[in-house]
Design a protein with these regions (language model features):
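N-terminal secretory signal peptides and thylakoid transit peptides that target proteins
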Residues: 1-24
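Catalytic cores and adjacent binding grooves of peptidoglycan-active enzymes
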Residues: 17, 42, 48-51, 137-198
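C-terminal segment of N-terminal export signals and the immediately downstream linker at the start
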Residues: 25-60
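Active-site acidic/histidine clusters and adjacent loop/turn architecture
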Residues: 66-118
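Structured segments of extracytoplasmic/periplasmic soluble domains
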Residues: 100-111, 126, 152, 162-169
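Surface-exposed patches in mature extracellular/periplasmic domains of secreted proteins
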Residues: 111-122, 170-174
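Charged, often glycine-rich, active-site loop that binds/positions anionic groups
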Residues: 127-140
Length: 198
Protein backbone atom coordinates (compact mmCIF):
# COMPACT_ATOMS: atom_id res chain seq x y z
CA UNK A 1 0.00 0.00 0.00
CA UNK A 2 1.36 3.43 -0.93
CA UNK A 3 1.83 5.51 2.20
CA UNK A 4 -0.20 8.35 0.76
CA UNK A 5 -2.96 6.16 -0.71
CA UNK A 6 -5.53 6.49 2.07
CA UNK A 7 -9.18 5.94 1.30
CA UNK A 8 -10.38 8.22 4.08
CA UNK A 9 -10.53 11.92 3.26
CA UNK A 10 -9.60 12.79 6.85
CA UNK A 11 -6.17 11.24 6.33
CA UNK A 12 -5.79 12.88 2.95
CA UNK A 13 -6.42 16.25 4.57
CA UNK A 14 -3.60 15.88 7.07
CA UNK A 15 -1.18 14.35 4.60
CA UNK A 16 -2.03 17.05 2.07
CA UNK A 17 -0.78 19.59 4.57
CA UNK A 18 2.65 18.00 4.55
CA UNK A 19 3.65 16.73 1.09
CA UNK A 20 7.01 14.99 1.50
CA UNK A 21 6.25 14.56 5.18
CA UNK A 22 4.37 11.35 4.29
CA UNK A 23 7.34 8.97 4.20
CA UNK A 24 8.94 10.29 7.38
CA UNK A 25 5.60 10.29 9.13
CA UNK A 26 5.05 6.58 8.46
CA UNK A 27 8.62 5.59 9.39
CA UNK A 28 8.66 3.28 12.37
CA UNK A 29 5.72 1.09 11.34
CA UNK A 30 5.91 -1.92 9.07
CA UNK A 31 4.45 -2.14 5.58
CA UNK A 32 2.19 -4.94 6.84
CA UNK A 33 0.37 -2.55 9.17
CA UNK A 34 -2.32 -1.57 6.67
CA UNK A 35 -5.20 -0.66 8.97
CA UNK A 36 -5.34 1.81 11.87
CA UNK A 37 -5.91 -1.05 14.33
CA UNK A 38 -2.91 -2.95 12.88
CA UNK A 39 -0.71 0.14 13.27
CA UNK A 40 -1.81 0.74 16.84
CA UNK A 41 -1.43 -2.93 17.78
CA UNK A 42 2.10 -2.92 16.38
CA UNK A 43 3.00 0.13 18.46
CA UNK A 44 1.46 -1.05 21.73
CA UNK A 45 3.93 -3.36 23.44
CA UNK A 46 3.56 -5.63 26.46
CA UNK A 47 4.39 -2.59 28.57
CA UNK A 48 2.40 0.59 27.91
CA UNK A 49 3.95 3.73 29.35
CA UNK A 50 3.56 7.47 28.97
CA UNK A 51 6.00 10.31 29.53
CA UNK A 52 3.97 13.46 30.14
CA UNK A 53 4.84 17.08 30.88
CA UNK A 54 2.43 19.78 32.02
CA UNK A 55 3.82 23.05 33.30
CA UNK A 56 6.20 22.12 36.12
CA UNK A 57 4.68 18.65 36.52
CA UNK A 58 6.36 15.63 34.91
CA UNK A 59 5.25 12.03 34.95
CA UNK A 60 6.53 8.75 33.59
CA UNK A 61 3.99 6.00 34.24
CA UNK A 62 3.47 2.42 33.08
CA UNK A 63 -0.30 2.10 33.14
CA UNK A 64 -0.63 -1.41 31.63
CA UNK A 65 1.45 -4.58 31.31
CA UNK A 66 0.64 -7.84 29.54
CA UNK A 67 0.98 -9.94 32.68
CA UNK A 68 -0.58 -7.50 35.15
CA UNK A 69 -3.22 -5.58 33.23
CA UNK A 70 -3.98 -2.01 34.29
CA UNK A 71 -1.93 -0.54 37.12
CA UNK A 72 -4.50 1.42 39.12
CA UNK A 73 -2.02 3.71 40.88
CA UNK A 74 -0.18 4.64 37.68
CA UNK A 75 -3.49 5.14 35.84
CA UNK A 76 -4.68 7.49 38.61
CA UNK A 77 -1.37 9.40 38.41
CA UNK A 78 -2.02 9.95 34.70
CA UNK A 79 -5.60 11.08 35.42
CA UNK A 80 -4.24 13.53 37.99
CA UNK A 81 -1.85 15.09 35.49
CA UNK A 82 -4.69 15.32 32.93
CA UNK A 83 -7.06 16.95 35.45
CA UNK A 84 -8.99 20.19 34.97
CA UNK A 85 -6.43 22.52 36.51
CA UNK A 86 -8.79 25.50 36.72
CA UNK A 87 -11.44 23.58 38.67
CA UNK A 88 -8.92 21.23 40.35
CA UNK A 89 -11.07 18.24 39.34
CA UNK A 90 -9.87 14.76 38.36
CA UNK A 91 -11.80 12.47 36.01
CA UNK A 92 -11.23 8.87 34.83
CA UNK A 93 -9.59 9.22 31.42
CA UNK A 94 -10.53 6.88 28.58
CA UNK A 95 -8.17 3.89 28.28
CA UNK A 96 -8.34 4.00 24.47
CA UNK A 97 -7.13 7.60 24.54
CA UNK A 98 -4.12 6.60 26.63
CA UNK A 99 -3.37 3.85 24.11
CA UNK A 100 -3.39 6.37 21.24
CA UNK A 101 -1.01 8.64 23.18
CA UNK A 102 1.21 5.64 23.94
CA UNK A 103 1.15 4.66 20.26
CA UNK A 104 2.17 8.15 19.16
CA UNK A 105 4.96 8.29 21.74
CA UNK A 106 6.26 4.82 20.79
CA UNK A 107 6.16 5.78 17.11
CA UNK A 108 8.19 8.92 17.81
CA UNK A 109 10.70 6.92 19.88
CA UNK A 110 11.20 4.53 16.96
CA UNK A 111 12.16 7.50 14.80
CA UNK A 112 14.68 8.74 17.39
CA UNK A 113 12.52 11.25 19.27
CA UNK A 114 12.41 10.42 22.98
CA UNK A 115 10.47 13.38 24.31
CA UNK A 116 7.49 13.74 26.64
CA UNK A 117 4.05 14.65 25.39
CA UNK A 118 3.38 18.21 26.53
CA UNK A 119 -0.20 18.47 27.80
CA UNK A 120 -2.03 21.72 27.04
CA UNK A 121 -5.47 20.51 28.10
CA UNK A 122 -6.94 17.24 29.34
CA UNK A 123 -10.18 16.75 31.21
CA UNK A 124 -12.41 19.83 31.49
CA UNK A 125 -15.49 20.38 33.59
CA UNK A 126 -18.46 21.77 31.68
CA UNK A 127 -17.87 25.15 33.30
CA UNK A 128 -14.21 25.25 32.25
CA UNK A 129 -15.17 24.08 28.77
CA UNK A 130 -17.69 26.93 28.43
CA UNK A 131 -14.94 29.42 29.26
CA UNK A 132 -12.49 27.88 26.77
CA UNK A 133 -12.26 29.86 23.54
CA UNK A 134 -13.42 27.87 20.52
CA UNK A 135 -14.41 24.77 22.53
CA UNK A 136 -17.33 22.69 21.26
CA UNK A 137 -20.28 22.46 23.64
CA UNK A 138 -20.18 18.65 23.37
CA UNK A 139 -16.39 18.51 23.62
CA UNK A 140 -14.91 15.11 24.43
CA UNK A 141 -12.72 16.88 26.99
CA UNK A 142 -15.71 16.94 29.37
CA UNK A 143 -16.00 13.14 29.34
CA UNK A 144 -12.28 12.34 29.64
CA UNK A 145 -11.87 11.35 26.01
CA UNK A 146 -9.68 14.19 24.66
CA UNK A 147 -6.33 15.90 25.15
CA UNK A 148 -4.48 18.75 23.47
CA UNK A 149 -0.79 17.92 23.05
CA UNK A 150 2.50 18.99 21.52
CA UNK A 151 6.01 17.52 21.40
CA UNK A 152 9.16 19.62 21.35
CA UNK A 153 10.89 19.29 17.98
CA UNK A 154 7.87 17.72 16.24
CA UNK A 155 5.65 19.72 13.90
CA UNK A 156 1.95 19.81 14.65
CA UNK A 157 1.28 18.47 11.14
CA UNK A 158 3.39 15.38 11.82
CA UNK A 159 1.87 14.88 15.26
CA UNK A 160 -1.68 15.21 13.90
CA UNK A 161 -0.87 12.80 11.10
CA UNK A 162 0.41 10.18 13.51
CA UNK A 163 -2.66 10.44 15.74
CA UNK A 164 -4.95 10.37 12.72
CA UNK A 165 -3.67 7.19 11.13
CA UNK A 166 -3.98 5.31 14.42
CA UNK A 167 -7.72 5.63 13.80
CA UNK A 168 -9.28 5.78 17.26
CA UNK A 169 -11.18 9.05 16.90
CA UNK A 170 -10.80 12.72 16.06
CA UNK A 171 -7.75 14.83 15.34
CA UNK A 172 -7.81 18.62 15.24
CA UNK A 173 -5.02 20.66 13.67
CA UNK A 174 -4.84 24.34 14.56
CA UNK A 175 -2.39 26.25 12.33
CA UNK A 176 -0.79 29.07 14.28
CA UNK A 177 -1.52 27.46 17.64
CA UNK A 178 0.82 25.30 19.65
CA UNK A 179 -1.11 22.05 20.05
CA UNK A 180 -2.94 19.18 18.34
CA UNK A 181 -6.30 17.90 19.59
CA UNK A 182 -6.62 14.11 19.92
CA UNK A 183 -9.78 12.29 21.01
CA UNK A 184 -11.51 8.92 20.93
CA UNK A 185 -14.91 8.47 19.35
CA UNK A 186 -16.02 9.07 15.78
CA UNK A 187 -13.16 9.12 13.27
CA UNK A 188 -12.85 12.62 11.85
CA UNK A 189 -10.31 15.34 11.29
CA UNK A 190 -10.52 19.08 11.07
CA UNK A 191 -8.19 21.94 10.37
CA UNK A 192 -9.21 25.10 12.18
CA UNK A 193 -8.16 28.07 10.08
CA UNK A 194 -7.28 31.24 11.99
CA UNK A 195 -10.18 33.68 11.88
CA UNK A 196 -9.52 36.98 10.15
CA UNK A 197 -10.17 40.07 12.21
CA UNK A 198 -12.74 42.45 10.75
Amino acid sequence: MNCCDFSHSRRRLVLGAGGSFCAAFLAGTSAAADTPEDRLRELLTDRRSLKLLRGDEQLEATYWTANGGYNRDQYLNICWLLRDMQADRVFPMNHGLLDVLCGVQTWLARTGIDAPLRIHSGYRTSKTNQRTEGAALDSRHIVGRAVDISVTGVSNVRLAGMASVLGRGGTGLYPGRNFVHVDTGNERIWIDRPRKKA
